[in-house]
A protein has these predicted regions:
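Bacterial Sec-dependent N-terminal signal peptides
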Residues: 1-21
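Aromatic-lined, polymer-binding surfaces characteristic
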Residues: 162-167
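Low-complexity, Ser/Thr/Pro/Gly-enriched N-terminal "stalk/linker" regions
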Residues: 20-88, 110-151
């Protein structure tokens, strides 16, 4: 009986494994998905309206300021002016990119290009290819390059998560 049970379990295991190996994950683009009238479409439209309600000049302000340029508008408050400056701008780029890919909305496309152009202005002003919104980030990276590295739980050389801030842009 034990032998029969073992053989049966083995056959079932092999069969399941064989069946599963024939399936492959296939990727698709967001533009290949169209939402029908549903709570999902409603949520997407709510997101779209929120994204367009944000001021790109306020979101690009930390990057322009750190590049020595005069921002067109003041930064948003809270995290955008207390040491984590620029991180919402990084999230905003992702939101714009994904919303454009999902909807093809031209207002989103123009907003994305505007943000990228403002970041390009900041990058050109710095002259090294760097873009950053963290206050004092240019000095921070000079310190790192010189080997002066003071890492903390959420900080690097006294700056609040500058690597996180960079990864949001790239």
């Amino acid at each position: 009986m034990k032998t029969t049970s073992f053989i049966l379990a083995l056959i079932i295991s092999i069969s399941i494994g064989k069946a599963q190996t024939n399936h492959q994950v296939s990727y698709f683009s967001l533009q290949d998905v169209k939402l029908l009238s549903s709570p999902f479409l409603q949520a997407q439209q709510t997101d779209l309206h929120y994204i367009l309600a944000l001021d790109p000049d306020r979101l690009s302000a930390p990057f322009l300021r750190e590049a020595g340029l005069t921002p067109k508008a003041p930064s948003y408050t809270n995290w955008e002016n207390t040491g984590l400056d620029g991180h919402i701008g990084g999230h905003y780029l992702s939101a714009l990119s994904m919303m454009y890919a999902a909807t093809g909305d031209t207002a989103i496309y123009h907003r994305l290009n505007y943000m990228l152009n403002e970041l390009h202005r900041a990058q050109q002003a710095v002259g090294t290819g760097f873009i950053g919104g963290t206050p004092g980030s240019l000095q921070l990276w000079k310190e790192i390059k010189a080997g002066d590295i003071r890492a903390g739980g959420f900080s690097l050389n006294g700056k609040w998560v500058p690597l996180y801030n960079i990864c949001l842009l790239y």
